[in-house]
Structure formats: structure tokens, C-alpha cells
A protein has these predicted regions:
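Bacterial N-terminal signal peptides
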Residues: 4-15
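Short non-domain terminal segments
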Residues: 8-9, 103, 405
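Active-site bordering "gate/hinge" segments
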Residues: 18-356, 361-366, 382, 480, ...
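Long, low-charge, small-residue-enriched segments that form tightly packed helices used
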Residues: 351, 369-548
Length: 548
């Protein structure tokens, strides 16, 4: 009776904005009650109480269907399960026990159902463990600061930016539909396509997905819920060249929900094109000599350049040096300086959910720390770095949160990392796409070259590289070309940039759903392509059964 009465009072206090259904009501009530108890009473004699505490709970289900040569090899639909995590900090906003500044999380199992008592019990268990770990970390941090004094600027920097109280419930706009029988039939048909390509072995086609709801309650009165969903259809296969080199490649189609996948006929076309490209690569001539000159990067190769330089570690993300450790690579010291070609402007969108007809999976309304991000942020303005993406841990150059903490897509833990929503690389006065190849040929002729290269994907031995004859513009696909790294210095000034834009969705660092709007091609000078020497493998004693 006491529990029912307290639950009713909770509903009246938080109102319909928080509680959308009975399940949500029970989960939030359990999290809030146990959080308040821990904040008030969790302390060992003579030790500090936590000043910050957050509980996160994820309810999720997963599925996977995999097939090979027309037969299903794995079909799995897991029921709803639960996982939780606790983040606990001692001290105050200026000085916490955190030494690494990447978030301190401790995970715990959770029931699949909204069981009030079980949820409270599990958060009680994990909070006790997190508190004891925080005490050890606080002592270790104190010792580390004595032996590794901070600069005056570092010492004045708070360890955490305060969050404003907020209640934000985000529900999936469309149900996540898992039709295992349908996907078994689809995967059978798609994987059977490889029966027509006897030189491709160890092929497979599959689809997997995650449907998750994340609940969060903090001691700062942040109450939030948001969905994290995706479905990924993949195909892979291997070929061996006549000289004994193994080449593997993969295809990936990423959407928010299984029902958002292209039609069966379109999927067949994509898998067939993938198989055809793998066969063309197998039979292509090898790169014969060293090349240094202009190279046109198109499509996936163009996106790789921007992702590798701007969106990986050391890119457009604020960085706080861990206590007692050497600093890592970061662009923060270049704020106010030119880092890329002045025709390029880089923006980050958070709420934009569609661009040029393509859904953007990087869209979100509230970040994983309860901060509402700006809908649009200019990170690089005409080549000049203006600001970085950041969470609530301030850095020397970025002392505020941009609302860029994103939940990591995994069913094994509830953690977050700094990541973009949708990055838009805008081009000022770009060149029409159909003129980019002409610009490549002209640049090659100006250097007295007989040929140049177009790179359409960068994937090791499976890279798609094309040799272009400057006389007639004809293209010949080649293989085993080792393309030199394209770093920021290379894109600080480029020869030409396409005005055409491509849109892609991807999982950044295999963690966070993100989207990228980028130039379809970029022409870069002084790129080296050399003949690589891939490892050769011995032929199997017996041939692949389809080759017999």
C-alpha cells in the first residue's frame, strides 16, 4: 500500500510528460527512489557522500539472420533484456574523483520487465560498488596530483560542468518491426546470388539489429528517455587472385529500423553489384610502378578522408588530458587557425532528420548527459577552426558542453562518448561533378604525366583504384595500390572540390550512429600510390566446392 501510494504521488508530481505508460512510470519511480536514498545515506564513516549520482537503464532486444549460398546458418531473435549502469562522483564540480575524464561507469544487470523492487536492488548493489571504487580513485587522484602538478590554467578548470534540471521523454516515432520469417526468406534469396560467382568463397549475407530504450535519472534532476535503434544488412565474400593473394570485401546498408531497408529487388541489385565488383577486382591488373601526382578521391574514398581527419580521435572533439598522463593528439590548439581548405565549412546538426530525401540516423533531441544541443553548430568556418564538440567535462579551449555526449550502441553496457550528430561539409564555389575528372586530367598533364588515378574506396587490398589515361580519359581498374595517407596538411589546400553532395549513415568507431553530408569528390595533389606487396597464401588442397 505504501509503494502504491508513493507511486501515485510520483505520477502527480512528474505528470504525463515523464510517464507515458505504466512501464515508464515504474522504472522512473524505482530509479528516483533509490537514487535519493543513495545520495542521502551512501557514506562510510568519516568519508564523503557522493555529490553526483546517475542511473541509466536500457531495455533492449536484438535479432540476427545470416545465410550462405541460399541456406540459413543462423537465425536468432532475442527477447527483451535489461542492462544498467551507475555513474558516481565524489567531491564537487571543481574537483571530482575522475582522473581520466572519459566517464566513470559501472554496469549491472537489470530485469527485462519493469520490476520496481528488482530495479532498486540492482542499483543499490552497483552504487555500493561504485562508491567504494570512487573512494579509491579519489585517493589515487590526490597522490597523482602531488607528483604531477597541474599548470595554473589546468588547476582552475572545473572537472564537470553543471547540468540544468530537465525532463525529456523521446519516444520512437515508428515501431521497430522484427519479422524473422520475412528476413529468413530475404537472406536466402540474397545469399543465393553468390552461387552464380564460383570464384567467390566464404560468402555470407545477413541482417542484424538493436532496438533499445534508454532511461536516465540523475541527482541533478535530469529525467530522460530516448530510443537507440538500428538495423544493418551486410554481405561479404573472398576471392583469390591468380597469383595467390586473398582479397576480402564487405557491403553494409544501415537504416534505423528493419522495415526501412530497400525493397528485395533493390537489395538483389546491390548484392549483385557487390559480387561483380569483387570479381572485377580479382581480375584487375596490378599497380606496376610508383606514382606521385594528382589523385581524384570519389564517393567512399572522399568520405574516408574527412572522417579520418575530422571525426576520429584527435579530430573535432574536445580533449581533457588525464591526470598524470601525457596529452594526446588534439586540434584544440588550432582554434582560430586554418585547418582545411578555405572553401570548406563544417557544421554539426542534431535535430535534422532528413537531407535531400535521405533519412539522417545521427539526429537526436537530447544528449546522453541530459543537455539539449544547439540544432546547428559551425565547427569550421571557411577553413578556420571555430569550436569543438564536447560533453560536460571542460577542456582548456572548450569549457562548455555542446550536448555531444551520445549513447554507445551496445547491449552489454550503458555508456556514452563524445560524437557528432550529422556533420555537413559544405563547399563554397565547388566544381560540377562532371568536370572533376577533366580537372584531374588537366592537373596530370600540367605535371607531364601520362596517367593519373581515381580512388573510389579505401579498403586495403579491396580498395577501388582506377588508372586514367590522360589522352582519352579511359579508366582501367587496378589492384594492390598502396595510397599514401591523406592527413590534414593535404586537405589544407586542395586542387578542386565537387559541388555535388553525398549523404551516408554510419556507425562512428563502431559505437555511435552518425551521418555525414560530404563532397562527392575532392582532387588532391602530390599523392603517392605505390605497388603493395600483399601476402600470398597457399592454395587449399581441394578447391571450393562450387569450383570443382
Amino acid at each position: 500500500m505504501i509503494y502504491i501510494l508513493s507511486l501515485l504521488i510520483f505520477f502527480l508530481l512528474v505528470g504525463p510528460v515523464v510517464a507515458q505508460n505504466e512501464q515508464d512510470q515504474v522504472i522512473f519511480k524505482a530509479m528516483q527512489d533509490e537514487l535519493q536514498r543513495n545520495k542521502a545515506e551512501l557514506a562510510l564513516p568519516g568519508m564523503d557522500k557522493p555529490f553526483y549520482l546517475s542511473f541509466s537503464l536500457g531495455r533492449f532486444r536484438q535479432f540476427e539472420v545470416v545465410g550462405e549460398l541460399g541456406a540459413i546458418t543462423n537465425s536468432l531473435e532475442l527477447p527483451w533484456r535489461g542492462i544498467g549502469s551507475s555513474q558516481l562522483l565524489l567531491g564537487d564540480y571543481n574537483n571530482t574523483n575522475d582522473t581520466r575524464f572519459v566517464g566513470q561507469f559501472m554496469k549491472v544487470g537489470m530485469p527485462a520487465e519493469a520490476d520496481y523492487d528488482m530495479i532498486r536492488r540492482n542499483f543499490w548493489l552497483v552504487s555500493d560498488a561504485a562508491y567504494k571504487m570512487a573512494l579509491r580513485e579519489a585517493a589515487a587522484k590526490e597522490a597523482a596530483l602531488k607528483s604531477n602538478p597541474q599548470t595554473p590554467e589546468e588547476a582552475q578548470l572545473p572537472d564537470l560542468v553543471k547540468a540544468e534540471p530537465i525532463t525529456k521523454i523521446v519516444e520512437s516515432k515508428v515501431p521497430y518491426e522484427i519479422d524473422i520469417k520475412k528476413w529468413e526468406n530475404t537472406i536466402r534469396e540474397l545469399s543465393a546470388i553468390f552461387k552464380n560467382y564460383k570464384e567467390i568463397y566464404n560468402s555470407s549475407v545477413g541482417i542484424s539489429g538493436l532496438d533499445m530504450e534508454v532511461y536516465k535519472q540523475t541527482s541533478e534532476d535530469v529525467t530522460m528517455k530516448q530510443p537507440v535503434t538500428y538495423a544493418n544488412l551486410f554481405a561479404q565474400g573472398y576471392v583469390t587472385t591468380e597469383d595467390g593473394v586473398r582479397i576480402g570485401d564487405a557491403l553494409s546498408i544501415l537504416v534505423a529500423r528493419p522495415q526501412d531497408m530497400p525493397s528485395l529487388e533493390d537489395l538483389k541489385k546491390k548484392v549483385t553489384a557487390f559480387a561483380e565488383n569483387l570479381m572485377k577486382l580479382r581480375n584487375a591488373p596490378v599497380v606496376e610502378e610508383f606514382y606521385s601526382g594528382p589523385v581524384l578521391f570519389e564517393d567512399g574514398a572522399s568520405s574516408s578522408i574527412f572522417v579520418n581527419n575530422l571525426l576520429n580521435q584527435g579530430g573535432l572533439f574536445a580533449y581533457r588530458k588525464p591526470i598524470g598522463q601525457a596529452g594526446g593528439r588534439t586540434l584544440e590548439g588550432r582554434i582560430g587557425r586554418k585547418i582545411i581548405d578555405n572553401r570548406l565549412t563544417v557544421k554539426n546538426y542534431t535535430s535534422l532528420d532528413k537531407y535531400d530525401g535521405t533519412p539522417l540516423l545521427g539526429a537526436y533531441e537530447i544528449d546522453a548527459e541530459g543537455v539539449i544541443p544547439e540544432k546547428e553548430m559551425t565547427l569550421v568556418d571557411k577553413g578556420i577552426l571555430r569550436q569543438m564538440l564536447n560533453g560536460r567535462v571542460p577542456s582548456l579551449k572548450t569549457q562548455h558542453s555542446t550536448g555531444s555526449s551520445r549513447f554507445v550502441m551496445t547491449g552489454s553496457d550503458i555508456v556514452y562518448t563524445t560524437a557528432p550528430g550529422t556533420i555537413h561539409i559544405q563547399v563554397d564555389k565547388g566544381t560540377k561533378q562532371d568536370k572533376m575528372k577533366k580537372a584531374l586530367i588537366k592537373a596530370a598533364k600540367d605535371e607531364g604525366l601520362d596517367y593519373a588515378y581515381i580512388v573510389r574506396s579505401i579498403a586495403g587490398p579491396a580498395s577501388r583504384i582506377y588508372k586514367v589515361d590522360v589522352k582519352d580519359g579511359s579508366e582501367t581498374q587496378v589492384r594492390f595500390g598502396d595510397v599514401s595517407a591523406i592527413n590534414l596538411a593535404k586537405i589544407k589546400r586542395v586542387l578542386d572540390i565537387s559541388s555535388k553532395e553525398n549523404v551516408s549513415n554510419y556507425i562512428l568507431n563502431r559505437q555511435v550512429l552518425s551521418s555525414l553530408i560530404y563532397p562527392a569528390s575532392v582532387l588532391i595533389e602530390d599523392v603517392e600510390i605505390n605497388k603493395s606487396e600483399p601476402k600470398k597464401e597457399k592454395e587449399p588442397v581441394l578447391k571450393f566446392p562450387l569450383q570443382r
